Structures are given as C-alpha cells and as structure tokens.
Amino acid sequence: MPKRQDISKILVIGSGPIVIGQAAEFDYSGTQAALSLKEEGYHVILVNSNPATIMTDAEIADKVYIEPLSIDFIERILRKERPDAILPTLGGQTGLNMAKDLSEAGILDELNIELLGTKLSAIEEAEDREEFKALMERLNEPIPESIIATTLEESLNFADTHGYPVIVRPAYTLGGTGGGIAQTHEELSEITANGLELSPVTQVLIERSIAGYKEIEFEVMRDANDNALVVASMENFDPVGIHTGDSIVTAPVQTLSDREVQMMRDAALKIIRALKIEGGVNIQMALDPDSYKYYIIEVNPRVSRSSALASKATGYPIAKMAAKIAVGLTLDEIINPVTGTTKAEFEPALDYVVFKIPRWPFDKFSTADRRLGTQMKATGEVMAIGRNMEEAMLKAVRSLEIGAIGLDDITYKDLSDDELLAALMPARDDRLFMIADLLRRGVSIETIHDKTLINEFFLDKVLHVIEIEQDLASHVGDIDQLQYAKKNGFADETIAKIWGKTAADIRTLRKDKKIKPVYKMVDTVAAEFESATPYYYATYEQENESIISTKKSVLVLGSGPIRIGQGVEFDYATVHAVKAIQRAGYEAIIMNSNPETVSTDFSISDKLYFEPLTLEDVLNVIDLENPVGVVVQFGGQTAINLAQPLLDNGVNILGTSVEDLNRAEDREAFDQVIKELALPQPVGKTATTVDCALAAAQSIGYPVLIRPSYVLGGRAMEIVSSDDELQDYMQRAVKVSNDHPVLIDSYLVGQEAEVDVLSDGETAVIPGIMEHIERAGVHSGDSMSVYPPQYLSQKVQDEMVQASINLAKAMNTIGLMNVQFVIHENTAYVIEVNPRASRTVPFISKVTHLPLAQLATRVMLGEKLSEMGFETGLVPNDDMVHVKAPIFSFTKLPDVDSLLGPEMKSTGEVMGSDINLSKALYKAFIASNIKVPRYGNVLFTVADDDKEEALELAKRFNDLGFALFATAGTGAYLSDNDLPVEVLDKISESDNNAVAALRQQKVQVVINTTQADDRAESDGRLIRNAAIENAVPLFTALDTVSAFLEVLESRSFTVKEMH
C-alpha cells in the first residue's frame, strides 16, 4: 500500500518536560518520527513545551512551536496551521491524553483533522480500564480478576471478597502514578483515594495481585494490511510487582521455553490485531513460573520507554517505522535502515544479551523511600550489551555512575545474614548488590529465591560473578583467570582490587598478553545478512567488526543516564557537537550508555559505541579508533571527570585545557583568578576538617552556603545558620566530596543571574543574560529564568558582561563556559564558573537562534569566532520574552521534601514565550501544569523572617478577590495588618486544619516558607505533601509567588467603588 497522498500537513505532539515516568525516550521517538515523515515528503509541524529537546530544533520539522501542551494552546496552533492529521502516539502519555481531549472537545471533528496511527477507539480500549477488560474477555485472553472502581467503597468491597494483597492501577496516568500494592484495608483506602484523585477520568482498576509471576514484555508492530511482527521480547529480572520502569530488564527473554515464548507471542499479535493499531504497541504479560498460565497486565497503544529500549537493544527503529506505517506504508514496503537490504517485516534476531538497569535519584534524595513498587521512581536508565549475561550485567552496573564498578563495591558489613535477607523485601533499588553480598556470604540461591521470587536462572548468573571474584582471589596473576574474568564483564579496576594492584597495572598486563576487546555490530539479523550499521559493543572474543575509517575522527563523550542535575540538556549538546564535527569533515564517534536518548540513535553519528563511560572503556575505544581528539565539554560532570585521567593516558582533550578545567573547580586556584581580575565575590574559605569548617564559618559569619567541590546539580549543598547545623552537615556530606575539600561561602541575599559564554581564547561572545526569578539560595536548575532580563539595571548587566569576558580570557576558555552571579546591593558578585556546556545551553540556543554547542565545537576544532562573523560582547536581545521554568516529580517521590533550596530537585523544564513577561510567565506556569485560578482561596504559612514580604503578596491576592487562609502565626500577623483571614488550627489540634482544607479542595494555592533551621518541622512538611498529593499549586519561594501574581493581575480587571 503506497503512502497516503490525501494528506500533506501533519502535526506531531511531543511529550513535554522530563518527569519520572516520561523521559528522554520521547525526544528520541519524536525526533525519529518527524524526520521520518519529512523523508516521505510531508509538511511536519511539531509542538512541544520542552526546549531541551532535539525535536524542537528548527531542522527537525518544517515548523516548530514551543508552547504549553494544553488544549487551549494546541487548539490555537490547529486553527492557525490547519493540519490534515495529528500523530499523537509518539508523545508518550501526554500526546495520547491530548488526542483524547481534543477529540472529546469536538475540535478534531470541527477542523476535519484525523488521528494517524492509532484510532481513538483503540486508545480508549487500551487505556480505559473497563473497555480493556471487556476486550480481553472478548478475545478470551486472561487478565487478573479485577473491578473498575470509581469510589473508595467499591475498592474495599473487592478486597473483602478476594482478599489481600491487591494492586491499584489508575486509568490514563503515567509511570504508575497514583498506583500501588495494598496489603491492608488502610493502605487500600489511601492508595485508592490518591489514585482516583490523579486519574483524569476518576477511575482505578483494583485487581488481585499476581506479584511473583514472571513479567514479560513484547514490542509489537502492525500495519494497515494486518502484517504484524514482534520486534523484541524482554524479560524483567524482577517478578511482577515492580513497575517495569523500575525493573532490571533483559533482552531477549532468558528463562522461557520455546513453547512459552510462542504462546505469549501469539497472544501479543492477537491483541494488536484486535485493537487495529497501525504502528507500535507495548504489551506487558505475567507468566506463572510453575505452569503455562499467563495473564495480560497492560497494553500501551503508543511508543513507550520500553520501545526506546527495544529499538536500541535490537537496532530496529520502532518510532521511525511507526511514523511510516501511520501514513499508509506497509512493513513489506519499508526498507530496514539497519541492513539497507532487508524489509522491515523481518523480526530482529539477537546474538547477544542486553541488560538494562534503572537509574534512581536516591543519591540526591537521602530521605526518599527506596522501596520499589507499582509506582515508578527512576529518573533514567542504562543499557549494556554483552555476549553473555554476566558481561552485560557488569557493564550495566559500571554505567550507572553510582560509585560501583563491580558487584563487590557496595557491601552490607553492618547487617547480619538474616537482617540482609529481611531487607531484600520489599525490593529496593540496590537489591542486585544485596543479592551479590548474600551469595558471597554463602546464602543459597534457593533461600534468596524463596524470599524474592526472582528466577533461579538470574540468581545463578549473579552467583557466577561471585565465583569468578573468588577464583581471581585464589589465582592472583593467573592469565587464564584474567581472560575468563574479562569475557564475563569484569572491569580492570575490579580485578586490580582483588589482586592488590592498580587498574593501570591490569591494563598494561592485558595489553602485554594481547587480551583486548573486539567490537561487534548490532545489526538486527544476528549476522545472517550483510549489514552496515555503525553501532557497536565491546566483548572479549576474536573477530573485530568495527572497521577503522581513513578519515580523521573525533570522539564525543555522552552524559550517561538521566539523573537530577544531569538531564537531557547534555544529550542535546552532544548531538549538536556531532553535527558540527561531521560538517567540519571529520568522522564523528559517540560513546554513551543511555538507551533513551537521541545521541544513541545509530543514524546520528558516523559510529556509535554503546559502552559504559569509564576510563577503561573509553581508552579501549581510543586504542582502536585513535581519534584526533576527545570532546568532554558536552557530557556533563560524567565527561569532565574523565578529562584528567584521559590526559594522563596521553589523550588529546579538545577545547579548554584540562589544566584550566581544573582551575575552575579548584577553589584556591579559582580565587586567585578572581583576585587578579578584581571581581566582586562572596567571602569564601576552604575546609578539609570539621574544626577547620567551623572556624571558617565563624569568621565569615552565618548564614553560609556550604558544598563539596566537583559537584553537579548542587548535590550535598546547603545553607547553614549555626555551628550545630554545620557539624551535622559535615558528618553527612564530607563523605561525598571525593577527597576534595568543602567550600564555605558567605550567603548573600539577592537575585541570581547567569550567562553562557562562547569563547575561542580571543573573542568572547555572550548570547544573552538569564535573570532568575528566585533569589540566591534556590539552585539555578530549580529557578525560573527569564531572557532577556527584565529587572536588572544596566550597570549590573554591564558588570556581568565584562566579568564574563574577562573570566573567559583568564581561564583560556575554548568552547563554552557558564558564569553564575548573585546581585547584591546593585553589584554583580561571581558565585560559580562551570568550564563546560551547562543545562541552559538548549534554552539560550533556542531563544537567541544561535546553535551554541555547534559553534563551540567548531571553535574546538580550530575555527575562529571572528571568521564566523562574531565579535566580543553581548549579542543584541530578542524582542520576545522567554521564561524557562523547572518541572518537579514530587508525586512520584512522596518522601522527598518539596521545599526548594540549594540542592537541585527538578527533573525537567518547560519554556513560555510571548511579547511581554506576564504572558510568557502565564505560558510557563500552564506548561508546568500549575493551574492559574481566576479566584479561590490562598493558604499562607510562612516563616517569621518572611512575614513582612508575605503581607504585600497577601494584599495583592486580596485585591484580586481571593480569600485568605493562614496557619496561626501567619494568620495573626495578616489580621493585625487589617487583612481578612481565616485562621486554621494546628494539624494535631482539630479537623479544621490546612491538610484537611487541601483534601477537601478548599484551597487553590499554597504558599509555604520555613526558617533555615526548621526544615523538618512537622506541620509545614505535611502541608507541602498534601498540596502535592492534591495537585494544588505549591510555592516555597516568595519570588515565584510574586511572578504568579503578576500573571493573575495581568489576566484580571480591577473593580473599584467610585463613591
């Protein structure tokens, strides 16, 4: 069936900001889809609210809108552009829900716009719990006994009849939001109430728990001619009961018999055909480990996180194929781009094992609940490929960047065998290390299986790793043992630790004995057909399949898994660097370990090495490829941390020299630069002991900002106000400082602002100044940011520009640099310099139309900015106003305090742009899913230090017609200042309290601040949690409230009596 000629203009809906449950995989799928449709000659319009994405680059679509993903704004775009069709299945749950809402609002029918790929009826049959249940019953496919509940009573009645535990799954939500496993009446009441609140259709599925069954996933494709194929089968290491996004996953399936695979494969194909989906579907199933009994758990009628994993695991580009199928092409017409010869109807075959481990944010959030269940908590993931499972597993472990190179790097010496065994359930993020430690102690596989229900096959693989550790220990220096350990994924560093040597010693020994990796191709056909995919993984075998080009090459290091502080912004910069390298005539090589990202799409670079970003793995690729240089500036702290060790091994680092990179991070060296340039800087000192830190803080004067050096995302950064707080911090945080000292600065109260600088050592270009809305003390990644600045004086702007130019020259910056300032008493103080691409690069690149990462790469390759037409100084401002706003995932991490501070907590960002600040702010709030009410009740509960400022804000709310609620202390202050206010009781005193008011939907906005020494105060924390749980806008910084009021005031009319 040829592609459709009756449509020409297609709108692709993106997935919005990165949140837990919906991350970079949708930038990858959306980018693939838009390019795929353009390739077929269609006019593509793309809408997304997230500026840190490749898909929102000008060249990806014919027209790009960075606008809120709300009905109101999408409708405006549809009326303006009049597309023939919408492709909603590549924008995650956001895109799917938007298609449903547009249809129900009658907009699609009115404008005669059709949905491509998946019909609305199929979306509803898969997403609506009642329709899904009815469909499975019609197909005679088994699902766990369940009911659809729309009330708490229905939920409790089901559990009374069927017994506990039961699983709660809300309809139309993302990453298991609002769901969970309930063991008791009380747990079920709480989870159901939360699930009904978070489901947009107020509907939850209550089902009998089948926790403990094997969890299997199939990625399936179908076209309009009813051709269908299974792209990948995947098996979760963890049994049913842990969200698949939090599960360790292997591909292909490992423990199923051929009969079981065929039985479940047939069911998957039957389901996609019954739903009549044209494109890709993810089907999750549960298999009884002791019989052939299985259940269908869930069907995702869209490209998903698992689709991205399956695409990277097999090399089969699911999103690209889904886009072509959506416009009428069939699988037997589409060429598989991997082989270039076979058709897309061939099912991929794997001659390797893939191992995925999620990346959780618990290193950032020490208070978070590390137990895993049906609600996803991971921010990202890593994938590794090996010839056996042990190899893939250990490569994945060292890709995580959690301080573990092997399974022996995290141990539990403080716990007895019984205590450690008990800690295995409920499962935690570190269960793989717990299992390894138990096996190391001699606890049997059977005992661990009985406790966890993890299949014995997987446990046996972990045991094999432990046995190799023990064999290495008893055969120190044995070359055969070394070779065998390398074949099974052991890092040089692990072997060195066991043998009492250094990793460099092991590397030298390996090279002497010709023990080195070869690189195998990921080709979708298990080497059965000729293939030319430039996509490789390392293994210790004989034949090397990576052919070295005669062209000069440049290696770009990616940023590894997505985590808080190091998000998709760095992948954006990596992809742009590759484009610039290719345009300069070099071969561009990417090395990365993240299956979700655009950078690990094999069509982006000339060569892709899907490998861990460790010194050993990077050096192995360099040994083979011999690039002219390595780019570390775009891979966040991951790549920067490799710069010095690579240089020590004779590798050429492109751009700013390693010596200058280190100068920016070394406090004393950096202070020297600041002194030489005579730049204002907060008083600061360095401390290496607790006593030293106390003396420093006392001499500077409290409050002080304290942090370890060499850190990303403000990890372990705090504002402390007393000796006691400082001592507490030093005990908790010095451990994370990597033998680097702790930095202590005077905490200056004032507004923050920042610039990115592009420099070639002679010319320093500043594309724009970004002014933060929140004052210093809130991490820059968690602040709302405005370009061009609206309130900074010209004097301050001039100071920032001149200081940044001087710093770029003094630091010999070749490429990018980020400088952060605090504006105190109308003077710009330098507070931080990052000698690399920062997380603001995509935002400032979009709003100034300057591809900063590409320009920086050209500079690193020797071009001069003057030759490109640039001169030193600030680029003229844009005539629009742009606001970057942070996005948080607190609903997924209920134990993490939502109070903002110097430690970064946001997972993503959105952008709002318009002709003035209030309109841009409005868009940013809407894109952030912050409701902007026209009227209602505002709850104030603020610290004593903030009461005077809060009074002015309360007056503004009152003038707009909002009613004021407050807790006792704040209420008394507002009342004493003649404002009408309803005072609420303490939570422990009566039911007339703030938490009850939130649960009863009586409050539309919450404003809560605390004293620096009162972070753990009980009522404030409970109020913040209640606001998050009930989706009520919560503000913990008064500057954000003022911006919010600016929006409310701009959208309202004033009514005043004349007499």
Swiss-Prot record:
EC numbers, comma separated: 6.3.4.16, 6.3.5.5
Pathway in which this enzyme or protein is active: Amino-acid biosynthesis; L-arginine biosynthesis; carbamoyl phosphate from bicarbonate: step 1/1; Pyrimidine metabolism; UMP biosynthesis via de novo pathway; (S)-dihydroorotate from bicarbonate: step 1/3
Coiled coil: none
Residues at which ATP 2 binds: 707, 746, 748, 752, 777-780, 820, 832
Start and end residues of each stretch annotated as Carboxyphosphate synthetic domain: 1-401
Record HAMAP family: CPSase_L_chain_A, CPSase_L_chain_B
Protein known as: Carbamoyl phosphate synthase large chain
Native source species: Leuconostoc mesenteroides subsp. mesenteroides (strain ATCC 8293 / DSM 20343 / BCRC 11652 / CCM 1803 / JCM 6124 / NCDO 523 / NBRC 100496 / NCIMB 8023 / NCTC 12954 / NRRL B-1118 / 37Y)
Gene: carB
